[in-house]
């Protein structure tokens, strides 16, 4: 896109890649892209890498999938800043995204956002995660959803009242039911 838009300064088209935690740390293509990111012909002016870190790769625990504590550690090979945020706190995710964009635009370098979260359901419709990760999924099932946590925050700080919030949920559910 940068080529076709004649974006020679690499400022108008911002590459963004979304990765799973296991894929980011385990697929060689990520390391290859980092290794080539500073080379003429491969430089994008910095890519924003977003890791959806659900702390499990299909059914594999992180300690069996990589040698480092965080999947984002791979970004250290190019000194990319790594921003960790809580997936249950949408405002922290937005804050990290703003920092990432500002950094990328100013320094033309890659940046990594590691959204630490969880997968409430299995890897796919045929996966029952409590078979392979019983302790983790016992905790996840008792943990409130991000929507519930953030909704309560907005209600408690007076951003929205409960009836308006419930109306938004109802309207959203109705739109989903209609296929919108």
Predicted region positions:
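Single conserved hydrophobic/aromatic residue that forms the stacking wall/gate
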Residues: 170-180
């Amino acid at each position: 896109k940068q080529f076709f838009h004649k974006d020679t300064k690499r400022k108008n088209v911002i590459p963004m890649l979304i990765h799973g935690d296991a894929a980011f740390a385990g697929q060689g293509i990520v390391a290859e892209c980092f290794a080539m990111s500073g080379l003429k012909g491969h430089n994008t002016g910095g890519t924003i890498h977003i890791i959806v870190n659900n702390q499990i790769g299909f059914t594999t625990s992180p300690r069996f999938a990589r040698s480092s504590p965080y999947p984002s550690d791979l970004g250290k090979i190019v000194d990319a800043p790594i921003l960790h945020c809580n997936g249950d706190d949408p405002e922290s995710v937005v804050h990290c995204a703003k920092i990432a964009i500002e950094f990328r635009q100013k320094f033309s370098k890659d940046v990594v956002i590691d959204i630490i979260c969880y997968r409430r359901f299995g890897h796919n419709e045929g996966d029952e995660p409590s078979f392979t990760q019983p302790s983790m999924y016992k905790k996840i099932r008792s943990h409130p959803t991000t929507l519930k946590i953030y909704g309560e925050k907005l209600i408690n700080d007076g951003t929205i009242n409960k009836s308006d919030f419930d109306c938004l949920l109802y309207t959203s559910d109705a739109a989903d039911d209609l296929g919108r």
